[in-house]
Amino acid sequence: MALSEDTIKAVEATAGLIAAQGIEFTRAFYERMLTKNEELKDVFNLAHQRTLRQPKALLDSLVAYALSIRRINELYELKGKDLPWTGHLAELQGFFSVAERVANKHTSVGIQPAQYQIVGAHLLATIEDRVTKDRAVLAAWGKAYEFLADLLIKREEEIYAETEGSEGGWRQTRTFRVEEKARVNEVICRFRLVPAKGGASVVQHKPGQYLAIFVRNPELFQHQQIRQYSIMSAPNSAYYEIAVHKDGAGTVSRYLHDHVDTGDLLEVAPPYGDFFLRYLEAGEQAAADTQASSEFQVLQGRAVNFAAEKTAPIVLISGGIGQTPLLSMLRFLAQKEGRETARPIFWIHAAHDSRVRAFKEEVDAIREAALPSLRVVTFLSEVRATDREGEDYDFAGRINLDRIPELARLEAGHANPHYFFVGPTGFMTAVEEQLRARSVPDDRIHFEMFGPFKASH
């Protein structure tokens, strides 16, 4: 359904008014919606409401959509008339990247089409309360929201159906048993999850994706809590492994550390997420290209395929618990390419100190068994008297890519490494700034921020 010129102009004209209100607008929206629809407190991360992370993310997304709505509409007008439309995708890649991340997050928490109607009603009511009471403008925003909701609902159904139809796949949640719980250090526990029904298989995740864990415990918290945790195991059909960092203020992380043990049951959604290492063999790539019909699928088809780029260097950069999705990627590369790999691979990790640094033994074991050329570099913000340079760490202080000369040599030699990085917000900002300063091309920068911030890139 294409939008009229009057609708587009009305939305564009009021986007600035919404942006000027800042997070006060989206905070008012969430307060209204969660007060009048208490059941949604079982879906939304209430901690992100308190810290204003979710209101900020919604504000940014809403304004970006309003400012891009004309070009988005043009794309769908062309598509509806069976005219060439893919040329519009390059300039709209940022919008569709955000939409893809939102769609994956929505499927992980089980969002249904009917819930879009609730959100839309409260969004329009908030616009009426805080921006304008003009009926024509409100009608325009109603049509614009319906347009966006329809786009997301269709994409989410594609994701639901693809996952459910895969071997070992399912929709919504499934009961898993904690087969093993192990303490990694004073702040991190790892969990191996297997289907509660013995012998059942699980859908293989893409290396870098996450699981959503659904937790109910009325004695400890009033509402259901849902959290996403990156999968750290290599793709397989038997189990998933996650690691949970115990956050002092984290409701679910503390619950998993203190109240969940081996043998306990958890409700788990399938693996989702748009941040992953894409690795399609020739036949798989051809099938994906043939099936690409939606704008999302076409954009995915343009993403780098590391099965085809056999010599492209890969640099995995992590801060703290951010290494878990990258560990899945590293294990996958060890399985797929191993000692025969033709590409340079770097594992760069930053930790506060050696006491909270995790998974050193796993990375060392992968290097010894399968990837002897793996270059491992460790930064410790604080070095203890017992730490040994070259063994426990390589550099003291915060991460600084300029201290790794091999990267500069690769870049100077036009090898154009691909950089994957994950970690806390400050860490992510620092790494991205360093890569931009090194003039690393956009298509070589791939990241995911924990929480509702940017889209994966």
UniProtKB/Swiss-Prot annotation:
Disulfide bonds: none
CDD domains from the UniProt entry: flavohem_like_fad_nad_binding
GO MF annotation list: FAD binding; heme binding; metal ion binding; nitric oxide dioxygenase NAD(P)H activity; oxygen binding; oxygen carrier activity
Residues annotated for NADP(+) binding in this entry: 320-325
Region (Reductase): 168-456
Binding of FAD, residues: 210, 227-230, 449-452
Enzyme class: oxidoreductase
Record site: Involved in heme-bound ligand stabilization and O-O bond activation: 30
Keywords carried by this UniProt record: Detoxification, FAD, Flavoprotein, Heme, Iron, Metal-binding, NAD, NADP, Oxidoreductase, Oxygen transport, Transport
Coiled coil among keywords: no
KW Metal-binding (keyword) present: yes
Annotated active site: 116 (charge relay system), 156 (charge relay system)
EC number: 1.14.12.17
Cofactor binding note from Swiss-Prot or TrEMBL: Binds 1 heme b group. Binds 1 FAD.
Requisite cofactors: heme b; FAD
Occurrences of domain FAD-binding FR-type (ranges): 171-278
GO BP terms, alphabetized: cellular response to nitrosative stress; nitric oxide catabolic process; response to toxic substance
Record-annotated site: Influences the redox potential of the prosthetic heme and FAD groups: 105, 448
Binding site for heme b: 106
Globin domain ranges (all copies): 2-157
Similarity section: Belongs to the globin family. Two-domain flavohemoproteins subfamily. In the C-terminal section; belongs to the flavoprotein pyridine nucleotide cytochrome reductase family.
Function: Flavohemoprotein involved in nitric oxide (NO) detoxification in an aerobic process, termed nitric oxide dioxygenase (NOD) reaction that utilizes O(2) and NAD(P)H to convert NO to nitrate, which protects the protozoan parasite from various noxious nitrogen compounds. Therefore, plays a central role in the inducible response to nitrosative stress. May also be involved in O(2) detoxification.
Subunit-structure text: Monomer.
Protein name: Flavohemoprotein-1
